[in-house]
Curated annotation (Swiss-Prot):
Top-level taxonomic group: Bacteria
Provenance organism: Staphylococcus aureus (strain Mu50 / ATCC 700699)
Similarity section: Belongs to the 'phage' integrase family.
Keywords annotated in UniProt: DNA integration, DNA recombination, DNA-binding, Transposable element
GO MF term list: DNA binding
Function: One of three proteins encoded by transposon Tn554 required for its transposition.
Claim: Lyase is one of the keywords in the record: no
Protein name: Transposase A from transposon Tn554
InterPro entries in the cross-refs: CB, DNA_brk_join_enz, INT_tnpA_C_Tn554, Integrase-like_cat_sf, Integrase_catalytic, Integrase_recombinase_N, Integrase_SAM-like_N, Tyrosine_recombinase_XerCD
Tyr recombinase domain: residues covered: 163-351
Statement: the UniProt record of this protein carries the keyword Mitochondrion: no
Pfam families, alphabetized: Phage_int_SAM_1 (PF02899), Phage_integrase (PF00589)
Annotated ranges, domain Core-binding (CB): 23-120
């Protein structure tokens, strides 16, 4: 199985297809990819979907079944196989550790179910019922009084343990920024920390997106990005940043950027032989690895975004404002992800309560 990138005539961005071991196009996946593209999914999302479906077809090949053989039992086996890949139908749970976390397995399962649902709507696959009525929904929708709190739950999805999102202390952030050797690297990490930007959003920035005089950054979705960095959800938004960050941006343009480029991407490679080319996703991942090695601080790029959001909430920002700043589609995502209290948060709030109580005496 192979995921193949292709250039399509009249499309300014690449698409991805799935090929079998004979390098023949897998037609059901091709139809699904076309549907995803027509409904506005980003090239990166389509690429991820292709790789997830590649796993399904590898599983089917190993089991000696075809798509129309897929039933509830095989889907359940597929979920187990994702965690414990095995050449046989027997899984030795005693000697193996799951290679994928529950959240990853659930993400892959969601893609597979969307794929099968699409084929079912075309009349090319028999629908599989994997849902049951459940209670206990966190968020009450507009029609909650009609549904009486019941919703559809996928019984194949794995239970995910609620994890405390790890954030960085201010001292650690300073060490990380100080460990950068270039203004470009400092600016990239500061945009994630102070602006809450994702890697794709940072790398998609063009010179016209940054308004230095008003300390604003416009995040603008574009169909064509040669470095394949895209804004998630394809929604525009504007964030405000500090004068200090804008000053760092200006210094980067003066001392490290080139005026002789044929493009206007903000972040470029500074390596000899590659100088001036738009920076790619892997380069930022490599940067983070270097900083981890230099500082001994274990962190990810997304942890900088987590830290920013958590600090905003601790400072009293309304969750709706945090949602808009981070670019979440739903406020519930912000609530579920960032409204978490550490033991220290609880202690601080209790001490404030005691102070107010003492003041009233």
């Amino acid at each position: 199985m192979k995921v193949q990138r292709i250039e399509v005539e009249n499309k300014p961005y690449p698409l991805y297809l799935l090929l079998d071991k004979e390098y023949q196009l897998i037609e059901p996946v091709m139809k699904f990819i076309k549907y995803l593209d027509n409904t506005g999914k980003s090239p990166n999302t389509i690429k991820a979907y292709c790789y997830h479906l590649k796993l399904l077809y590898e599983f089917m090949e190993q089991r000696g079944v075809i798509l129309n053989d897929i039933n509830f039992e095989l889907l359940a086996d597929f979920v187990g196989w994702l965690r414990y890949p095995s050449a046989s139908n027997v899984i030795d749970l005693q000697s193996k550790k799951a290679i994928r976390e529950e959240t990853t397995v659930n993400t892959i399962l969601n893609v597979v179910m969307s794929f099968l649902d699409y084929l079912s709507r075309l009349g090319e696959f028999k629908s599989i019922d994997v849902f049951k009525q459940a209670k206990g929904r966190n968020f009450k929708g507009f029609l909650h009084h009609v549904n009486k709190g019941r919703y559809q739950k996928n019984v194949l999805k794995l239970r995910v343990k609620k994890k405390q999102i790890r954030t960085l202390r201010s001292k650690e952030v300073k060490q990380i920024i100080d460990a950068c050797h270039t203004k470009r690297d400092k600016l990239i990490l500061m945009l994630m920390y102070e602006g809450g930007l994702r890697i794709g959003e940072v790398l998609s920035l063009r010179l016209e997106d940054i308004v230095t005089w008003d300390n604003q950054i416009h995040l603008t979705p574009r169909d064509v990005n040669v470095n394949e960095a895209y804004i998630k959800l394809r929604k525009e938004r504007t964030i405000h940043v500090s004068k200090e960050l804008m000053s760092l941006y200006t210094d980067y343009l003066i001392y490290e950027y080139s005026e002789e480029l044929e493009h206007d991407y903000v972040f470029i490679s500074l390596k000899e032989g590659y100088f001036g080319k738009p920076l790619k996703y892997q380069s930022v991942l490599d940067l983070v690895r270097r900083i981890v090695k230099r500082t001994g601080i274990e962190f990810t790029s997304h942890m900088l975004r987590h830290t920013h959001a958590t600090q905003l909430i601790r400072e009293g920002w309304d969750v709706a404002f945090v949602q808009k700043r981070l670019g979440h589609a739903h406020v519930q995502t912000t609530l579920n992800t960032y409204v978490h209290l550490s033991d220290q948060d609880m202690k601080n709030e209790f001490n404030k309560y005691l102070e107010r109580k003492e003041h009233k005496k």
